[in-house]
Design a protein with these regions (language model features):
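Membrane-embedded and interfacial regions of multi-pass energy-transducing membrane proteins
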Residues: 2-589
């Protein structure tokens, strides 16, 4: 750690602030750190660890579905518990934490030209509350009866009733408590991201000079700050129903002929609260992915992003529209047909700004000097996958088509393509792209290409056949389907094939983790800007960046984030902090 003093040219106020927030002991530097970069690594490591738990749970589910009756320890109750924990971990504790807590913490201060987040101490607390939420969630595996088996959507009354897989006394209480903690921690971090983007930008960094990665993370954070309160309220009310006997979501109901001590609640109210959060959550994950892909494509195609302002407004438009489509998840809940028509219409409208982004990505690639690096391969794979998943979403957004497909494997396939495979491809692409900045070394190229092809092709061999199973009427949420009147013999064989592919893709991730760890010491030295990128994170005086990011002087921004192939320039890129004019400006007006 380099000691920083006023003699180095940094204003005394900034030195005092940095010393206050970042003491030099090992314990406070690497464990209770207030450096956003260290916190980002902590978020990413924790999310990866809990993500591996979700991967193992998916393997257990696929064992049961692919080879029913073979593994006696996978009981129906255990199967539903696996579904619940796998879904909740992947959506909330892995993807949200990775994109916002991981990439958001590392990239926002560097990309906007700040020394750190505006509130470093609050940022540190947000991570430790997230870690506590993860530990509370994992503890439910060791609670009496195990974790809740209510499904990752936690629908009442099953989630509340005692004696059901969903209503395990401690399982559901720990799940709800964990979600409440997660939302508290995220709110602390999210406010930090928003304030840093709005108030922490360096001189010359206007909003329309921000990289699209920052726009994606910023918009997703604002959405989360608006959507998570609905889930928070739903969790608190359900916790009261389960622990205190209230009736927010429990209707008058009889269990085995005995009237339960609840009455007057509405399970549909919970669905509205959950999906008011749940559908924006799709784009809370997707919008950072959109921004990252835009930066990857522009950098590795050596071409300015096409339609920057359109891309920004498309991100904002998607974020706004995502709050008026939630009830398309509830077509089979008894909704009035007129409401179904309204939500089907808004669902189709949201495809317009999404299509703008796809067309602009394609036009950015058009006649570009495309370098098929590993980050670029993952970015291209994301575009293909998201388009495929979006096309099936057009089917499910239509009431007439959704009703017969709602409880089939078609929905599972669509959801995993859009919410699982596509974002994970971006996560991998981003790691391969920014790993040199974080560690100063490159990941192994051969292992990286093997990882890409095994993941990309394997994911399609898992989820494409699943669409076919859904069209055959194979239901989801069943732990065992052996009756040939429900599933044909060919469908059973297909299920077994999907399970085998799930294991192959899972083991490919072990190769990736090995590459990640091995390259820290043995990877090729990357230099300061191996991709010859224009954005500020690549212009730091040290790699990896020291605390304070930019040494004694913060950068001054003179241009937008995508000056590639500029006539008259010495190289095919001009960093944002380089002054001067080279030919006609391509910066958006």
């Amino acid at each position: 750690m380099v000691d920083i003093t006023p003699a180095d040219g940094i204003p005394p106020a900034e030195v005092a602030e940095m010393e206050l927030y970042h003491p030099h002991s090992w314990w406070t530097k690497y464990v209770f750190s207030q450096d956003a970069k260290v916190i980002a690594i902590q978020y990413s490591a924790t999310a990866t660890g809990i993500g591996l738990v979700a991967l193992v749970l998916s393997w257990l589910m696929r064992l049961q579905l692919g080879f029913p009756g073979t593994f006696d320890f996978i009981t129906p109750e255990a199967y539903y518990q696996f579904i619940t924990m796998h879904g909740m971990i992947m959506v909330i504790y892995l993807l949200t934490a990775l994109f916002l807590g991981g990439f958001g913490n590392y990239l926002i201060p560097l990309m906007v030209g700040a020394r750190d987040m505006v509130f470093p101490y609050v940022n540190m607390l947000s991570y430790w509350i997230y870690l506590l939420a993860v530990l509370v969630l994992v503890s439910s595996f060791f609670a009496p009866g195990g974790p809740t088996g209510a499904g990752w959507t936690l629908y009442p009354p099953q989630a509340i009733m005692s004696g059901t897989p969903g209503g395990q006394d401690w399982g559901i209480i720990l799940m709800l408590s964990s979600l409440i903690l997660f939302i508290i921690g995220f709110t602390m971090g999210g406010l930090n991201y928003v304030v840093t983007v709005l108030q922490g930008r360096t001189r010359g960094m206007t909003l329309m000079r921000l990289p699209l990665t920052v726009w994606g993370i910023f918009t997703a954070t604002v959405m989360a700050l608006l959507a998570f309160p609905a889930l928070f309220v739903a969790c608190v009310m359900m916790l009261f129903d389960r622990a205190l006997g209230t009736s927010f979501f429990m209707p008058a109901i009889s269990e085995m002929g005995e009237q339960l001590q609840h009455g007057g609640g509405s399970p549909i109210l919970f669905q509205h609260l959950f999906w008011f959060f749940g559908h924006p959550e799709v784009y809370i994950v997707a919008l950072p992915a959109f921004g990252i892909v835009s930066d990857l494509i522009s950098t590795h195609a050596r071409k300015n992003i096409f339609g920057y302002r359109m891309m920004v407004w498309a991100i904002v438009g998607i974020g706004a529209l995502s709050f008026v489509v939630w009830a398309h998840h509830m077509y089979v809940s008894g909704m009035h047909p007129y409401f179904g028509f309204f939500f089907a219409t808004t669902t189709l409208i949201i495809a317009i700004p999404t299509a703008i982004k796809v067309y602009n990505w394609v036009l950015t690639l058009w006649r570009g000097d495309i370098h098929l690096t590993i980050p670029m391969l993952f970015a291209l794979a994301f575009i293909v996958t998201f388009v495929n998943g979006g096309l099936t979403g057009l089917f499910l957004g239509n009431v007439v088509v959704d009703v017969p497909l709602s409880d089939t494997m078609f929905v599972v396939a669509h959801f995993h393509m859009v919410m699982g495979v596509a974002p994970i491809l971006v996560v991998f692409g981003a790691i391969y792209h920014w790993y040199p900045k974080v560690t100063g070394r490159m990941l192994n190229e051969t292992l990286g290409r093997f990882h890409f092809w095994a993941t990309f092709l394997g994911a399609y061999l898992i989820f494409f056949p699943m669409h076919y199973l859904g069209l055959m009427g194979v239901p989801r949420r069943y732990n065992e389907l052996t009756d040939m009147t429900v599933m044909t013999e060919s469908a059973h064989h297909l299920n077994s094939f999907i399970s085998i592919m799930a294991f192959i893709v899972g083991f490919a991730q072990i190769v990736f983790l090995f590459n990640l760890i091995w390259s820290i010491r043995h990877g090729r030295e990357a230099g300061g800007n191996p991709w010859r990128a224009t954005t500020l994170e690549w212009q730091t005086p040290q790699t990896p960046p020291a605390h304070g990011n930019f040494g004694k002087d913060l950068p001054i921004v003179y241009r937008w984030a995508y000056d590639y192939s500029v006539p008259g320039a010495k190289e095919d890129f001009i960093p944002q902090n380089v002054p001067g004019s080279f030919g006609p400006s391509k910066e958006p007006a």
